[in-house]
Amino acid sequence: RHTIPLNNVVAENYEAVFFVGGKGAMFDFPENKAIQAIVRNYYQSNEVIGAVCHGPEALVNVTLDNGHALLEDKAVSGFTNEEELLLIPEAESIFPFLLQDKMIAKGARFNSGIMYLDKMSHDKNLITGQNPWSVWSVAETVIKQLGHEPKHREITAEENAVDILIAYHQQGSQKAKELIEKKLNDKEKSIDRLLIAKHSIIAAMKGDVSGFFNIIGLVSFVKKMELKA
């Protein structure tokens, strides 16, 4: 009840704007004139703009004063077609457009990472992330871009799981297991086994049978190492 309507926001009172995602952003953000004005003014004033998952929908229809699309020749990330269509095969008929397609159509250099894992792009004062598992890196990069050092914090169990899954996809099961052991040797660290297990389901949905069993093996290995610890 205390949310300020965008039309009433005095953008000059803030140093940064951060757009989070959710499917509703696909309908609410692209045509919102208040959002377009804030983003255009922030970008041209070199203020910091962060957006993650479907949050970059806020950027797709912004035109700068020079007549060029904001996204033209910008390195960006956002929820990918592959991620969208795996979860919602009929997404193209439900949503006005797919975010990846729209960003590319606006001239963006779209950077995609592994499905449902951390991927961030940083282009001057524009910081974007692919999905909800990019939120930590995007948020901390926004803080650094503002000229501050993020406060020390404990790395979450979810982040540790993301690191392990990235290691698996990029370097294989053995490297992922080595990383599991390394993380669990630090008694303060925990690993979100459920998140890793969910990626076995993603592998199955993609028809990747070996990936399914490999990731299930990682879940079992985490449990085994936790019991040893």
Functional labels for PLM-detected ranges:
Residues 1-50, 54-229:
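Active-site-adjacent pocket-lining segments in enzyme domains
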